[in-house]
Design a protein with these regions (language model features):
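Helix-adjacent hinge/juxtasegments
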Residues: 60-63, 67-81
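Structural preference for long, well-ordered alpha-helical segments within the folded cores
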Residues: 23-24, 90, 123
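Vicinal oxygen chelate
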Residues: 1-4, 94-133
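Short, solvent-exposed loop/turn elements at beta->coil junctions and helix N-caps
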Residues: 37-41, 64-65, 103-109
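Core segments of cupin and vicinal oxygen chelate
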Residues: 14-56
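Short amphipathic alpha-helices in soluble, non-transmembrane regions
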Residues: 27-28, 90-94
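N-terminal beta-strand motif that seeds the catalytic metal site of vicinal oxygen chelate
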Residues: 1-20, 74-79, 133
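Exposed loop/turn and edge beta-strand positions of beta-sandwich/beta-sheet ligand-binding modules
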Residues: 45-47, 73, 113
């Protein structure tokens, strides 16, 4: 049987303030805004913004009442980087606080090991920068 060969299209994140979140993802994480849309509903407008960086795409969703949806949790969004030390330094220079002081390292995670560290976005979403070794 032929495999479906699925890839990740995007990750949707519920946000309280679309403008604050767009600025964070564009200015701090250097995502490009690729598309915006307002979904008209009887209960109020839902604001959507799609942003991308390399082959990573996210969808920011602001519900009409700016409250988190009941659609279930997303634990974190991991962003792939080639030089975690450099990216971390850039993010720190932009005021991003990290959850831990040290970059985590596991030599047995993935074929050649992995390094990662977590931080939070403007709506408390947990973000990770991750370098596969």
């Amino acid at each position: 049987m032929e495999k479906l060969n699925l890839g990740l299209a995007h990750i949707g994140l519920t946000v309280r303030d679309m403008e604050v979140s767009k600025r964070f993802y564009q200015d701090v994480l250097e995502f490009d805004l690729t598309y915006e849309y307002t979904l008209k509903k009887d209960t109020g407008d839902i604001l959507l913004a799609f942003l991308s960086s390399g082959n990573c795409a996210i969808e920011l969703v602001q519900p009409p009442d700016s409250q988190p949806r009941e659609s279930g949790p997303v634990d974190h969004l991991a962003l792939c980087v080639k030089d975690i030390d450099r990216v971390r330094a850039v993010l720190e220079s932009r005021g991003v606080p990290f959850e831990t002081g040290d970059i985590h390292y596991r030599p047995d995670l993935f074929p050649n090991g992995s390094r990662w560290v977590f931080f939070r976005g403007p709506d408390g979403e947990r973000l990770e920068i991750n370098e596969l070794l």
